[in-house]
From Swiss-Prot:
GO terms for cellular component: cytoplasm. 5-phospho-alpha-D-ribose 1-diphosphate binds at A129, N130, G131, R132, A133. The gene is xpt. One of its GO terms (molecular function) is xanthine phosphoribosyltransferase activity. Homodimer. This is Xanthine phosphoribosyltransferase.
Length: 190
């Protein structure tokens, strides 16, 4: 998505050779008008697919999933929770995922009420780095005996293993921007 690449170059910043910060428009402050363009693009990429629910992981994926939902007939948005919560049902699907950004492993959970057998689920998230979050969500979908339509990623770090890992697991991956490298403050796209 050319407009996304241009926005990253214009408004993003880098830290080291592996961190791309897009907090000015995607995951801290949100440019809702631009997020609508992202939602439209995901609809185009997954055109013709039946999507019953949009699935993500807290927290940065929630805003993206909510906008994307509007382009899939307002499909409900479900997000896996990383933290313990007194108001989360005890009857949950659960798996462990490693977060590249936080450099730690999380137990993520989703209530069995919200992912159901036979449903067609589209995963969306802001970043793909090592692919563990997406594979964790895929595991939750499989536990529920639901169907994974695919994974929609706003920004894939192509220099990390996530994309290859998802493809090796027969996951349809649609990344709107793939960063080939971050070198000396310069972002290069695939």
């Amino acid at each position: 998505m050319k407009a996304l690449q241009e926005k990253i170059l214009r408004e993003g910043s880098v830290s080291g050779n592996d961190i791309l910060k897009v907090d000015s428009f995607l995951n801290h402050q949100i440019d809702v008008a631009f997020l609508n363009e992202i939602g439209r693009e995901f609809k185009e990429r997954f055109k013709g697919e039946k999507v019953d629910k949009i699935f993500t992981i807290e927290a940065s994926g929630i805003a993206i999933a909510s906008i994307v939902s509007q382009y899939f007939d307002n499909a409900p948005v479900v997000f896996a929770k990383k933290s313990e919560s007194k108001n989360l049902d005890k009857d949950v699907y659960e798996t462990n995922v490693y977060s590249f950004t936080k450099a730690r492993e999380y137990s993520v959970k989703v209530s069995k009420k919200y992912i159901n057998k036979g449903e067609n689920i589209l995963i969306v998230d802001d970043f793909l780095a090592n692919g563990r979050a997406a594979l964790g969500l895929k595991d939750l979908i499989e536990q529920a005996e639901a169907n994974l339509v695919g994974v929609g990623i706003v920004i894939e770090k192509g220099f990390q293993a996530g994309g290859a890992l998802l493809k090796a697991n027969d996951v349809r991956l649609e990344s709107l921007a793939v960063v080939e490298s971050i070198d000396n403050g310069t972002v290069k796209f695939r």
